[in-house]
Amino acid sequence: MDFLNYAFMQRALLAAVLVGITAPAVGIYLVQRRQALMGDGIGHVAMTGVGLGFLLSWSPVWMATAVSVVGAVTMELIRWYGKTRGDIALAMLFYGGMAGGVMFINLAPGGSNANLTSYLFGSLSTVSESDVTAICLLAAFVVVVTLGLRRQLFAVSQDEEFARVTGLPVRALNLLTAITAAVTVTVAMRVVGLLLVSALMVVPVAAAQQLSRSFAATFAIAVAIGVTVTTGGTVTSYYQDVPPGATIVLLTIGAFIALSVLAAPLARRRARALAAAQPAGDPAECAIPATRAAGDEVGV
């Protein structure tokens, strides 16, 4: 535990815990909306914000947040009103964001692509006190939104038409989800890196779904996995001198594989128990449900 004696490791671990909480908390809604790659798109757009921050001598974290929010809102507007296919528009934001980041950081006084590396792949030693303050504020916003509006966000993510019929402001909630995802990307970029943050938003959720189909349980398990792999990856990167972002993502994928292997026999045992409990010849076995509830895929 000697790493706790160093201030930079204390800051890095605090940031890692916040990232482990916020990334899966937002990712569960993106997975339900089948927008798992949205984090990648926002991460590329955030590069432009980082480059602008260096160019204008402003905080790269806050500038990346502002640019990411604009990019996320633009993605939603294109999805609603654009005549260009959604995947083409997303690709343009991908490459435009990356090109803008490289260009701006090279135009900055004394700037070079090396300055961008810690934001692309994460860095423990460069997490400053101001970064931690910004991360704490942004993480608080993400937690309030994802927990406070969990029922509304789940309804919209699961079935927009059903949510609209019940009177929910679907477009406003979609925009809020996109903005929250953008904020989460900037929260995670100092620890995981912009190019790898999407994995931490998606893979813990996919791993949690191997164990549970309930929304609440999936949410809790995904956050637990997120915190475990981010703190474990941060400590491992300190002792082994390896990139923290890559370490965290590899641990996350390892957790997914391990839970998938463990979940298979559990699923078979559950199926056998259900079959044994079901009376032979019960008409319910052949019954066709009349309606599809909004929570059929992942129970609330």
Regions from the language model: what does each represent?
Residues 242-300:
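Cytosolic-side transmembrane-helix boundaries in multi-pass membrane proteins
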